[in-house]
């Protein structure tokens, strides 16, 4: 990170930075997420993986979750694929230099414990990992008509702290992708249901719109069916 941000660093490039003043233009930054992870390490004096394990993973019994290969059972790791035309190519497991931006390895079952905790104001099964006011701040829309980037349409999108509001503000959560991976974790604020979806094949950005109006919406419909039937899987 120092080599990326420092003007004398070997990874520094002025083209990596916008010329807009803060607040005038929105663009999600993985590097900024990595920087946030580093700030936690500086503030707490603990490595992010150790901090996460002590204050989040262990208390919530997320036993199949970790940042590094050494912290998980590799036998349970999904095989990742990359699409090349009409064929699938296996991708060997890989790590991320800026791992806080998306390198956590978990399961839907484990991540649901964290998601439920957030939806319950920072508490799950009697275990509190965040203050209510912290969760409220994280999930509060940060943009208003008075204060918003020029390239943001508030009817379609808003942002919390690492949380996005889409579908006209109806759904809040986060999505992301890397080679061989696409993930979704969203909560419908009107219907009061949430979904988590992991894919072990990369989803191209050009395919996202069609995916959201087909598979993504169908999964939410199925979640409503489970809720209405008072069943779970």
Label every PLM stretch briefly.
Residues 32-37, 112-113:
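Well-ordered alpha-helical segments within folded domains of soluble proteins
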Residues 64-75:
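Short, surface-exposed recognition loops and adjoining beta-strand edges that mediate ligand/DNA contacts
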């Amino acid at each position: 990170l120092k080599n990326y941000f420092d003007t004398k660093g070997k990874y520094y490039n002025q083209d990596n930075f916008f010329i807009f003043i803060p607040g005038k233009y929105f663009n999600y930054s993985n590097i900024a997420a990595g920087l946030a992870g580093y700030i936690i390490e500086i503030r707490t004096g603990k490595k992010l993986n150790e901090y996460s394990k002590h204050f989040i993973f262990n208390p919530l019994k997320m036993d199949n979750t970790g940042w590094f290969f050494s912290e998980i059972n590799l036998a349970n790791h999904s095989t990742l694929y990359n699409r090349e035309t009409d064929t699938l190519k296996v991708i060997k497991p890989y790590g991320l230099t800026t791992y806080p931006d998306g390198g956590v390895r978990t399961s839907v079952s484990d991540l649901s414990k964290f998601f439920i905790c957030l939806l319950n104001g920072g508490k799950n099964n009697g275990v509190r990992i965040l203050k209510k006011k912290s969760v409220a701040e994280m999930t509060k829309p940060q943009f208003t008509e008075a204060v918003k980037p020029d390239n943001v349409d508030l009817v379609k999108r808003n942002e919390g702290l690492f949380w996005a509001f889409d579908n006209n503000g109806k759904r809040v959560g986060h999505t992301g992708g890397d080679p061989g991976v696409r993930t979704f974790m969203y909560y419908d604020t009107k219907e009061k249901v949430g979904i988590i979806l992991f894919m072990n094949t990369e989803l191209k950005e050009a395919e996202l719109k069609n995916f959201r109006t087909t598979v993504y919406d169908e999964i939410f419909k199925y979640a409503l069916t489970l809720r209405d039937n008072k069943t779970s899987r």
